[in-house]
Design a protein with these regions (language model features):
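Positively charged n-region of N-terminal signal peptides that target proteins for export
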Residues: 1-6
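Flexible, glycine- and charge-enriched loops at secondary-structure boundaries
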Residues: 9, 89, 240-243
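Ser/Thr-centric signal marking residues that sit
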Residues: 35, 86, 203-204, 265
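Bacterial N-terminal signal peptides
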Residues: 7-17
Length: 316
C-alpha cells in the first residue's frame, strides 16, 4: 500500500511537471535574426525574423545571413520549411538560396518542397532561383542517389489580405501596407494560443498596421530616421525616408495600438551624407520616439529574442 501511495504521488508530480511544460509550450518565441538594411553593417544583418510557436518554425523575410543567424539562435532547423516574404526588395530575399538549399545538404532535414509565401512576383522569384541553381541542384540530387529530390523544389504562393497559413494552432494573417507601390508589400500577424505578434514589414505610416496591431502582445515595427537638415539638403535621402515610417509616426502607432511591448527592427538611419551606421543616429531616433510615447519600447539588436506568454519577456 505504501509503495502504491508513493507511486501515485510520483505520477501526480510528473503530471504537474507536464502541465508546466505545456504552459511553456504555449508561448511564442520571436528572434530578430537581422535588424538592419541593405547596407553592409557587421552589427546588423539585413531584415529577417524567426517565429517559433508549438511545432511551427516560421521565417519572415530572409535577409543577409538569415540561415546562419537562425543556426546561432538555437532554433530547430529541422522544422524550418516555411518562409513568408513581406516584399521582394533585395535585402529581404537575398538569403533565400541559403535557407532553401541548406535544408537539403547533409545532414539534410527537408524532403518536401520549400514553402514560400509572398506578394505578386513571388512565383517568378522562386522559378528564377530554381533555374539559377539548376546545375547545383542536379549535382546534389545525384550525390544523394535521387533521394529527397522534392526537397529541392519550391511551393510558392502569392498572398493577399487575409489568412495565408494555419496549422498546429498557429495562424498567419497577411495585411497590405504601403511601401513603394500598391499590392507589393505586406505585414503579418501571427497568432497562437491566445498570443499575438505583428510584424509591420517595410511601410510608411499605415492605418492597416493599426488595424491589425491593436492590443497585440508584441509589435515589431520598422523605422526610418534622418534629421530635418538631411531631408532638406539631400533629395535621395528624402525619397528613401518617404518609403519608411518616421519616428514620430511610429510613436503615434504605438500610442494607438498599445502593444505590451514594441520593438524596432529594420532600422534605417541617414545623415545628409548617406547611411549612418553609428549608434548616435539610433539614439537620436529613440529620443524622438520617447518625446511622444512613454510605453515600453526596445531598439532591436541582431539575435535579440522575446518570449510572448502571459507577459512579454526579453530573453537576450
Amino acid at each position: 500500500m505504501r509503495a502504491l501511495k508513493i507511486s501515485l504521488i510520483l505520477v501526480v508530480i510528473a503530471l504537474q511537471g507536464m502541465g508546466e511544460l505545456m504552459a511553456q509550450d504555449g508561448v511564442i518565441k520571436v528572434t530578430l535574426l537581422g535588424t538592419g538594411t541593405p547596407q553592409l553593417n557587421p552589427a546588423r544583418m539585413s531584415y529577417s525574423t524567426l517565429i517559433e510557436a508549438g511545432d511551427e518554425v516560421l521565417m519572415f523575410d530572409a535577409g543577409r545571413a538569415a540561415m546562419l543567424q537562425a543556426k546561432k539562435s538555437g532554433a530547430n532547423l529541422k522544422k524550418l520549411n516555411k518562409l513568408f516574404l513581406t516584399h521582394l526588395h533585395s535585402d529581404h530575399v537575398i538569403g533565400i538560396p541559403d535557407v532553401w538549399l541548406t535544408g537539403f545538404l547533409a545532414p539534410a532535414f527537408r524532403a518536401t518542397p520549400f514553402q514560400l509565401w509572398g506578394p505578386a512576383g513571388v512565383k517568378n522569384l522562386a522559378a528564377g532561383l530554381r533555374q539559377a541553381y539548376d546545375f547545383d541542384v542536379g549535382i546534389r540530387i545525384k550525390q544523394y542517389g535521387g533521394k529527397r529530390a522534392e526537397g529541392m523544389e519550391f511551393d510558392a504562393t502569392q498572398i493577399h489580405d487575409g489568412y495565408v497559413y494555419e496549422s498546429n494552432g498557429v495562424k498567419v494573417t497577411a495585411f497590405e501596407v504601403h511601401h513603394t507601390g500598391p499590392n507589393s508589400a505586406y505585414g503579418y500577424k501571427i497568432e497562437y494560443n491566445g498570443r499575438s505578434v505583428v510584424l509591420s514589414g517595410d511601410t510608411t505610416y499605415d492605418e492597416n498596421v493599426i488595424k491589425y496591431a491593436k492590443g497585440v502582445d508584441l509589435l515589431v515595427h520598422q523605422v526610418g530616421y534622418a534629421p530635418e537638415e538631411a531631408l532638406a539638403k539631400n533629395q535621395v535621402v528624402a525619397r528613401i525616408m518617404s518609403h519608411h515610417t518616421q519616428p514620430k509616426q511610429v510613436a503615434k502607432i504605438f500610442t494607438v495600438t498599445q502593444p505590451k511591448l514594441a520593438v524596432f527592427s529594420h532600422i534605417v538611419v541617414f545623415t545628409e551624407k548617406g547611411p549612418d551606421l553609428s549608434s548616435d543616429g539610433e539614439e537620436k531616433m529613440m529620443e524622438v520616439v520617447r518625446q511622444t510615447y512613454d510605453g515600453p519600447v526596445v531598439l532591436g539588436q541582431d539575435l535579440m529574442a522575446f518570449e510572448v506568454g502571459d507577459t512579454v519577456t526579453q530573453l537576450q
